[in-house]
């Protein structure tokens, strides 16, 4: 008799934040929802901190959120976990729940998504031991897999690669015209060449590379404008504004603040280059979002950005600590220009590897 596969997906956030990990969670929960119909799976999903859900991602999944109530989360996780064949954990901070369920049901399969910086930090001895013996680790990039192996001594054979993919509801743009309303909003003209970074601007991280871009701007033509977007804490905003002032870039840098998801497409179309020469990116979903809009990237060659850029096929990989190399790559990309045929080719290459359907096929293969 056929035994229905039961999956429990545990997350910290899925819909109430908009970072890279949350984008991954939204795609995963939509894939699991598809599998309920396609393979007759039973899927429960439980979020610790969410206070809302978006129904289009969860039509066939039993999704609950507990608004930060850890006791309620534990009770619901153990209840659903006692029946599940597979537990998928979206974050290392949920590992304790995998451990408890594994103690209750030793045959339960435990899968952990490993994104980047959150799992490169020092781990307690019990986490390292549990990861080494009882958990399948699905890393978002080759770099993240290597960091887990090197930092924690975990056998590389226990670590699988599942690159991130595009949102299931992202529609490839049919044309690559710059939006007039953003040109007007940011006081731009047809003569301006536009660099764009979308990142969390955090004083506690500072690995996204926008410092290097600001420094590189000093040697770039005066018609190059830099749009730096993302939520910033007060300390980091103050530091960035000082850099802009020190480099005399006040007329050439725009801090846009947080951009909601429904505005991102227009900003990717506005940009000539998406530039983020990071030093600690686990993957970088923004790189593939840019490419899906025909926008090439300049990224660092020392982290997971290499996977996102297909080792240079979706843009330029540079030493993220070398200002001259970053500036040179930007100049080279600007000289090429964003011709429609180039944008279309870039978009097609991106969709071939990172479309939602391809992401789902890769996910099912590992599952």
Task: Kindly give the residue locations of the regions a language model identified.
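Carbohydrate-associated surface elements
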Residues: 143, 165
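Short alpha-helical donor nucleotide-sugar binding micro-motif in glycosyltransferases
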Residues: 258-259, 266-271
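Conserved donor-binding/catalytic core segment of Leloir-type glycosyltransferases
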Residues: 8-10, 189-208, 214-217, 227
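Aromatic "clamp/platform" in nucleotide-sugar-dependent glycosyltransferases that forms part
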Residues: 279
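Glycosyltransferase donor-sugar binding loop
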Residues: 45-50, 198-201, 225-241
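Conserved acidic donor-binding segment of nucleotide-sugar-dependent glycosyltransferases
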Residues: 311-312, 316-323, 332-337
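Short hydrophobic beta-strand element within catalytic cores of glycosyltransferases
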Residues: 296-299
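Nucleotide-activated donor-binding/catalytic signature segment of Leloir-type glycosyltransferases, i.e.
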Residues: 238-259
